[in-house]
């Protein structure tokens, strides 16, 4: 059963000018033999002349066995099964789109393959039938192979009725919904940035407070921003969101507002860490750091109290 496999899309071969994801299997005199990952690993070839626009000095710098590459289809012979590919004709924009499509299609494939495992399918034909009755229905409906199924499955997390039109029995539907929810339910991410804000003028403390308050005002209902002091002049900014890209953008905007406000008062603004998604490990480390600083501050306060008491005793 581990051998179950199927192509990602309804058509068995890519079309000319399609940009596809391949894995390099071997390198020969004529070019590189590759497997088309979205088409059940059928073989294709990248001719040496199609590897680079420049003169090739070292083929290993351009392509390596085991590496995934984005390539464009330049010829397909469906009868003989020949597929000629080009790496040099793929633009950076096309490469990004290919990566996005492959990632989403692979997610759909993983969901359906796991459904097949749970339902104890034993043949590739059963998996292909599942694709025909689910993913390919949406790909065809929305005329967007790869994207149609992914978007429909994502929508099914909040509205499972989108699957009602599919030809599925009760078990298949239940297992499919469970797997869609497991893989596609949005996960909240925490985004963090570290900044330094200081102002050494007459009203420096008020200027810092005002600048930080302006940053906090960039919060939205779904994306509240928090600012905590690590140790003057360093602060940590955080927000939690389901939308990673939007979260990074909102935190960047808040930083820009703080910078503008503090510099109006001739203060100083430095970025210690650009906005990034943080892990539990990062959070644990920050908590430890802040705890240590609190202890140090408490010790300093204790020393001050002792000195004050000694001074009173002397008086």
From Swiss-Prot:
In-chain residues carrying the UniProt-annotated modification N6-acetyllysine: 141
Post-translational modification: Phosphorylation at Ser-49 and Ser-52 stabilizes the eIF-2/GDP/eIF2B complex and prevents GDP/GTP exchange reaction, thus impairing the recycling of eIF-2 between successive rounds of initiation and leading to global inhibition of translation, while concomitantly initiating the preferential translation of integrated stress response (ISR)-specific mRNAs. Substrate for at least 4 kinases: EIF2AK1/HRI, EIF2AK2/PKR, EIF2AK3/PERK and EIF2AK4/GCN2. Phosphorylation on Ser-52 by the EIF2AK4/GCN2 protein kinase occurs in response to amino acid starvation and UV irradiation.
GO terms for MF: ribosome binding; RNA binding; translation initiation factor activity
Subunit structure of this chain's protein: Eukaryotic translation initiation factor 2 eIF2 is a heterotrimeric complex composed of an alpha (EIF2S1), a beta (EIF2S2) and a gamma (EIF2S3) chain. eIF2 is member of the 43S pre-initiation complex (43S PIC). eIF2 forms a complex with at least CELF1/CUGBP1, CALR, CALR3, EIF2S1, EIF2S2, HSP90B1 and HSPA5. Interaction with METAP2 protects EIF2S1 from inhibitory phosphorylation. Interacts with ABCF1. Associates with ribosomes. Interacts with DDX3X in an RNA-independent manner.
Entry keywords, A to Z: Acetylation, Cytoplasm, Initiation factor, Mitochondrion, Phosphoprotein, Protein biosynthesis, RNA-binding, Translation regulation
Subcellular localization: Cytoplasm, Stress granule; Cytoplasm, Cytosol; Mitochondrion
Gene name of the encoded protein: EIF2S1
Span list, region Disordered: 293-315
Protein family: Belongs to the eIF-2-alpha family.
UniProt protein name: Eukaryotic translation initiation factor 2 subunit 1
UniProt-listed SUPFAM superfamilies: eIF-2-alpha, C-terminal domain, eIF2alpha middle domain-like, Nucleic acid-binding proteins
Modified positions (Phosphothreonine) in chain numbering: 279, 281
GO BP term, pick one: response to endoplasmic reticulum stress
GO cellular component: cytoplasm; cytoplasmic stress granule; cytosol; eukaryotic 48S preinitiation complex; eukaryotic translation initiation factor 2 complex; mitochondrion
InterPro entries (alphabetical): NA-bd_OB-fold (IPR012340), S1_domain (IPR003029), S1_IF2_alpha (IPR044126), TIF2_asu_C (IPR024055), TIF2_asu_middle_sf (IPR024054), TIF_2_asu (IPR011488)
Organism: Pongo abelii (Sumatran orangutan)
């Amino acid at each position: 059963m581990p051998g179950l496999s199927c192509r990602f899309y309804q058509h068995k071969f890519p079309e000319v000018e399609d940009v596809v994801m391949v894995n390099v299997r071997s390198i020969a005199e004529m070019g590189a033999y590759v497997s088309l990952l979205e088409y059940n690993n059928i073989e294709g070839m990248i001719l040496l002349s199609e590897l680079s626009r420049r003169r090739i000095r070292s083929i290993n710098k351009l392509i390596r066995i085991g590496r995934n590459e984005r390539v464009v289809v330049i010829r397909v012979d469906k009868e003989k099964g020949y597929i000629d590919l080009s790496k040099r004709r793929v633009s950076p924009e096309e490469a990004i789109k290919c990566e996005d499509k492959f990632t989403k299609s692979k997610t759909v494939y993983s969901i359906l393959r796991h459904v097949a495992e749970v339902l104890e399918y034993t043949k590739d034909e059963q998996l292909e039938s599942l694709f025909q009755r689910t993913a390919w229905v949406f790909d065809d409906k929305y005329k967007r192979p790869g994207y149609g199924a992914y978007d429909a499955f994502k929508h099914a997390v909040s509205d499972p009725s989108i699957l009602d039109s599919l030809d599925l029995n009760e078990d298949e539907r239940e297992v499919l919904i469970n797997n869609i929810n497991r893989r596609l339910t949005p996960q909240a991410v925490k985004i963090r940035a570290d900044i330094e804000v200081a102002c050494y003028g007459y009203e420096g403390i008020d200027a810092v407070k005002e600048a930080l308050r302006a940053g906090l005002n960039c919060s939205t209902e779904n994306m509240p921003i928090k600012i905590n002091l690590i140790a003057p002049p360093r602060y940590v900014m955080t927000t939690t969101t389901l939308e990673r890209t939007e979260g990074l953008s909102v935190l960047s905007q808040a930083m820009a507002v703080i910078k503008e406000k503090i510099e109006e008062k001739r203060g100083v603004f430095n970025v210690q860490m650009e906005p990034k998604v943080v892990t539990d490990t990062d959070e644990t480390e920050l908590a430890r750091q802040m705890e240590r600083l609190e202890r140090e501050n408490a010790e300093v306060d204790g020393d001050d109290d002792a000195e004050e008491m000694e001074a009173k005793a002397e008086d």
